[in-house]
Amino acid sequence: MIRRPPRSTPKPSSAASDVYKRQADSIVINPHKWLLTNFDCSAHFVKDPEALVRTLTILPEYLKNNESENIIDYRDWSIPLGRRFRALKLWFVIRYYGVEGLQEIIRKHIKLASQVEEWINRSGNFELVTPRSLSLINFRFLPEQNGKFLDIDELNLKLLNELNDSRSVYFTQNRVRGDFVIRWSIGQTNTELRHVEDAWIQVQKIASSLN
């Protein structure tokens, strides 16, 4: 019998703290992945913008104008001279949700992933292959072999394929230290606890049918 997992409220955590930011010279994020922005949109933060501009700037005569020395020209911040106007859609998202609204969504997803992490650790026949990273989990089905040989990689590949073929959930694959694992990423805007619970029940149900 597959039981609905008990609910708990683990405290969410985030690696995006000032401690980590100070260790980086540049940070690139994709708002189209976790900030509710339509594809495509990337944001680039640099500690020393002048170093980036010195590296990439070109100024032939035909690009000069009266304001060349007085403005920030973002063509000097990347290899292509031109780009689509991606900033406006991100601006609208930030204006609508605000920083606190976006933080709330991200923290909710991290909290949901923390719940999944707890279920996996308590399951007995699933293994958390790496520590959870924000809302990303790498896990695999690791049942008791009871004297019979099991190809764990092949078993998890079959589990992944059957989960995705069910069309009720979708996972991706990964390899960690050579082992085949299933990659569970929580980041869809409208994901709620009930969706994650249903996904976990589906994982257990299909895994039980394979063992």
Per-region residue spans from a language model:
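Short, hydrophobic beta-strand segments
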Residues: 92-93, 138-143, 182-186
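Short beta-strand
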Residues: 127-132, 171-176
